[in-house]
């Protein structure tokens, strides 16, 4: 399939004449995007129940705290009480699709309906103007989970048990209230303040969904290292959150993810195999009770996996204050520091990629859908797909087109809707195109030498938290610089970016379709079918 349509060029002059095309379902045009300044009507509201007044009437926006795919988080001060808060300002122009708009609405709904909890960040208010949606929330200024652990110096199994109990309690509270988080990872937990006894809080509900008992989901979302096997199989429920919490616990105890490889497909295969390594240091120092809990949280069969309440009832969690208080050694702290810094490096690279992911790339796919949808019903039949692929120059044979159709047709209606079609095209085009990585590499290669050297890496990782230690730079260089010449070349950089990267930081829609594409690959090469034969579990396609 290497020659599928990697070089496809869409010719707008080739589209059907004298036909008024309707937009494909699920991919409505962005109502906030007005590049020519011709808007003559008020924009639609993203959050119907948001405050009608201006946010500046109530709050003072200060310095920037962080930046994401859709907007910027600012320090925010209540004019009357002087309380310090955080304001996440989401740019409407960056909500490119109806799916993006729905994501924001759902995040606000979930944060508004969850009961107050000491370990969940509180949404204080929402405001909306013509340009932005503003979410005013509790301020968490105590730093990320791993950064705090590294800074403390003394790190023990008892400390890991305390963190695990907090995360399990958040999961339990979400599930009791019909919320599946779907994106649990260390970066989504911040400490409220810098005090030693500060509360740890869950901060990001952007991929969360409401669920009913027995309801199953098919959308592939989340972050690579933390995905449960049933997510890759597109047939899952709230048990995925316990799996993700188990991955975090494994990392807390030994400093590295349980399922790792140099490519996303390798990570996915490791997750499907589900083999846990308890032989490397420091596992010999860790209690059998802790290992038992990790195994039960990372049980590949979701029907046998512990629930969040059962995690909280486990003896290791119940006796957290009695867990071994012996330091796990510098090896775990140094691994956690390297893991945290590597994530920071990837986040900076993804920010560069996000700025170069043009809306035109997605427009090409939209236009291809319109071109192939001969009867304008918002769906593409097998015959339309076959004819359309031939029209744009694809050399795919009949068996391969049939396989693509079968695997991508998630709802089994014999046709592809827009979302399913996007998955097929990304699968064929391999949207991780070289230009995106090249732009990010050039951002770090300040002197244009063709290499990222130690000082350039140090500069890239220096932020409001200060400069990284020499040991961290050395560790990252050691891992990424595979030819051991003391610098990172372009090929080594690409390998790093393809291993376990959270692509949602570049584009949430891109991430969704990317992992759907990965699922297609695994199904096509038989990996999932082999896994099912070994485990007796089935995949819902």
Curated annotation (Swiss-Prot):
Residues 30-39 have a biased composition (Basic and acidic residues). PROSITE patterns: EF_HAND_1, EF_HAND_2, PROTEIN_KINASE_ATP, PROTEIN_KINASE_DOM, PROTEIN_KINASE_ST. The modification Phosphoserine is found at residues 223, 507. It is a lipid-anchor. Residues 360-395, 396-431, 432-467, 468-503 form the EF-hand domain. ATP binds at residues 65-73, 88. It catalyses: L-seryl-[protein] + ATP = O-phospho-L-seryl-[protein] + ADP + H(+); L-threonyl-[protein] + ATP = O-phospho-L-threonyl-[protein] + ADP + H(+). Induction: Induced by ABA, IAA, 2,4-D, GA(3) and 6-BA treatment. Its main location: membrane. Keywords: ATP-binding, Calcium, Kinase, Lipoprotein, Membrane, Metal-binding, Myristate, Nucleotide-binding, Phosphoprotein, Repeat, Serine/threonine-protein kinase, Transferase. Highly expressed in root. Residues 18-28 have a biased composition (Basic residues). Ca(2+) 2 binds at residues 409, 411, 413, 415, 420. GO terms for molecular function: ATP binding; calcium ion binding; protein kinase activity; protein serine kinase activity; protein serine/threonine kinase activity. Ca(2+) 1 binds at residues 373, 375, 377, 379, 384. It is an enzyme of class 2 (transferase). It is found in: Membrane. It holds the Pfam family Pkinase. SUPFAM superfamilies: EF-hand, Protein kinase-like (PK-like). A lipid is attached at residue 2 (N-myristoyl glycine). Its EC number is 2.7.11.1. Residues 323-353 are annotated as: Autoinhibitory domain. Belongs to the protein kinase superfamily. Ser/Thr protein kinase family. CDPK subfamily. May play a role in signal transduction pathways that involve calcium as a second messenger. May be a positive regulator controlling stress signal transduction. Acts as a calcium sensor involved in the hormone-signaling pathways. There are 3 contiguous domains conserved in the CDPK subfamily: a kinase domain, an autoinhibitory (junction) domain and a calmodulin-like domain. The autoinhibitory domain (323-353) inactivates kinase activity under calcium-free conditions. This is Calcium-dependent protein kinase 30.
């Amino acid at each position: 399939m290497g020659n599928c349509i990697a070089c496809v060029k869409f010719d707008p002059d080739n589209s059907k004449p004298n036909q008024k095309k309707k937009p494909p379902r699920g991919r409505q045009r962005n109502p906030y995007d007005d590049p020519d300044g011709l808007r003559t009507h008020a924009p639609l509201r993203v959050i119907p129940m948001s405050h009608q007044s201006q946010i500046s009437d109530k709050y003072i926006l200060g310095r920037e705290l962080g930046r994401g795919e859709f907007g910027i988080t600012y320090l925010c001060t209540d004019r009357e009480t002087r309380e310090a808060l955080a304001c996440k300002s989401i740019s409407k122009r960056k909500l490119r699709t109806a799916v993006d708009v729905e994501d924001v609405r759902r995040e606000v709904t979930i944060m508004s309906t969850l009961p107050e909890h000491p370990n969940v960040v509180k949404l204080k208010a929402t405001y909306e103007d013509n340009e932005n949606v503003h979410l005013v929330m509790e301020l968490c200024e105590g730093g990320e989970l791993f950064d705090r652990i590294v800074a403390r110096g003394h790190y023990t199994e008892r400390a890991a048990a305390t963190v695990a109990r907090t995360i399990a309690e958040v999961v339990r509270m979400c599930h009791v209230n019909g919320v599946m988080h779907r994106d649990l990872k260390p970066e989504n937990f911040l400490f409220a303040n810098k005090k030693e006894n500060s509360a740890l809080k869950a901060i990001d509900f952007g991929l969360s969904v409401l669920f009913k008992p027995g309801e199953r989901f098919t959308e592939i979302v989340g972050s690579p290292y933390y995905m449960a096997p049933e997510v890759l199989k597109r047939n899952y429920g709230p048990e995925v959150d316990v799996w993700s919490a188990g991955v975090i616990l494994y990392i807390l105890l030994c400093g590295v993810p349980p399922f790792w490889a140099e490519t996303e497909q390798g990570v996915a295969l490791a997750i499907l195999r589900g083999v846990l390594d308890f032989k490397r240091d420091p596992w010999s120092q860790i209690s059998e009770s802790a290992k038992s809990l990790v195994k039960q949280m990372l049980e590949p069969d979701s029907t046998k996996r512990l629930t969040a309440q059962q995690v909280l009832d486990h003896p290791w969690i119940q006796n957290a204050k009695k867990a071994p208080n012996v330091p796990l050694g510098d090896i775990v702290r140094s691994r956690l520091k390297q893991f945290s810094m590597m994530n920071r490096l990837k986040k900076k690279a993804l920010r560069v990629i996000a700025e170069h992911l043009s809306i035109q790339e997605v427009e090409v796919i939209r236009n291809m859908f319109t071109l192939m949808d001969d009867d304008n019903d918002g769906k593409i039949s097998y015959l339309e797909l076959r004819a359309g692929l031939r029209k744009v120059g694809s050399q795919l044979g009949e068996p391969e087109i049939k396989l693509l159709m079968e695997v991508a047709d998630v709802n089994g209606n014999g046709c592809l809707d827009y979302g399913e079609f996007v998955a097929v095209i990304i699968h064929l085009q391999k949207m991780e195109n070289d230009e995106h990585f090249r732009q990010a590499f050039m951002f770090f290669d300040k002197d244009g030498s063709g290499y990222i050297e130690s000082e350039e890496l140090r500069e890239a990782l220096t932020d409001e938290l200060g400069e990284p230690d020499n040991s961290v730079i050395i560790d990252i260089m050691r891992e990424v610089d595979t030819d051991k010449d003391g610098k990172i070349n372009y090929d080594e950089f690409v390998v790093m970016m393809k291993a376990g990267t959270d692509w949602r930081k570049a584009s949430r829609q891109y991430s969704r379709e990317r992992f759907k594409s990965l699922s297609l690959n695994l199904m096509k090469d038989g990996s999932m079918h082999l896994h099912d034969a070994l485990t007796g579990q089935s995949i819902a396609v």
